[in-house]
Amino acid sequence: RDSVGGQNSASSSPVLLFQYERPEVERIYPTHSPVIGHGVVQIYGRNFGAVDYKPEAWIGGVKCESTLWLSDSQIECRVPVGIGSNHSVVVEVGGQRSLARRLFEYDAPLPEALFPKTGPTRGNFNITIGGRNFGYDDHGVEVLLGDKPCVRVVWLSDSAIQCTVPPGSGQDMVVRVRVGDRWSTSQKLEFSYAGPVVHSISPGSCDTRGGCRIKILGENYGTMRVSSLKAYIGSDDQYGKNECEDLKFINSTMLQCKVPPGVGVDQRVWVELTGRKSDPNFAFSY
């Protein structure tokens, strides 16, 4: 070793280090993919290597299924499976990683088919929703029928889920699905509860002064007494119909009310709920 003034040159000489600039991700195309993955995304940027140094890429912390170097400014990633939005994209070349850029999202769920599309107001039956992007596994999928959450949701596949319908009433309720942090946005798929049906009236007659309490037996009367639930006796026009008084909701198959004053035999009786009318039943007479 050389020494000057008793100092060793090896210990006093500075060590000179050199490194290339880290890779930099600028943009990607496309910016989204189905949740089942396998799509191809082009990653554009800088410092990916003048030759193929076998770069690697990650989306949302998951390594791309494969990464193909194309140039110093472009590589290709085969997208892994995933869900959600706002995912980071990272490239590594020669042991150096780019800063994370949140550029990628998986497609939102898309409900496209529903069977059956209607059902009784008592609920607790299953409907199957067909579509896309429901997830590559059970990610705690959520389903709303209008503003009503399904009692239970069972993930079947990326293209099918099952919903246990809650008790309720109403029609044309948009079906919405959430997977991860993404909600479906389509307004085309709708569910409706079946309209009311009158099967029989007991007793089937009352004197013309009214005041008798009758039971109206049927189905799809809803889940509770609401202002839109009404029962009528008489013709279906504003002059002939008489609204039952003191209407009481017993359950989805029975109503009770006081008969209004009236005359005539074979009077039509019908129930209305959220604007939907039952077909008339002619089982009541004064």
Enumerate the predicted regions with their spans.
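Residue-level recognition of beta-strand termini and adjacent short loop/turns
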Residues: 71-73, 157-159, 251-253
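Short, surface-exposed alpha-helix to beta-strand junction/turn motifs within ectodomains of secreted
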Residues: 48-64, 134-150, 221-241
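Surface-exposed, short loops/turns at beta-strand junctions within beta-sandwich domains
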Residues: 80-85, 166-171, 260-265
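Extracellular recognition modules
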Residues: 1, 88-92, 174-178, 268-272
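Beta-strand/beta-sandwich contexts
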Residues: 5-52, 96-139, 182-228, 276-286
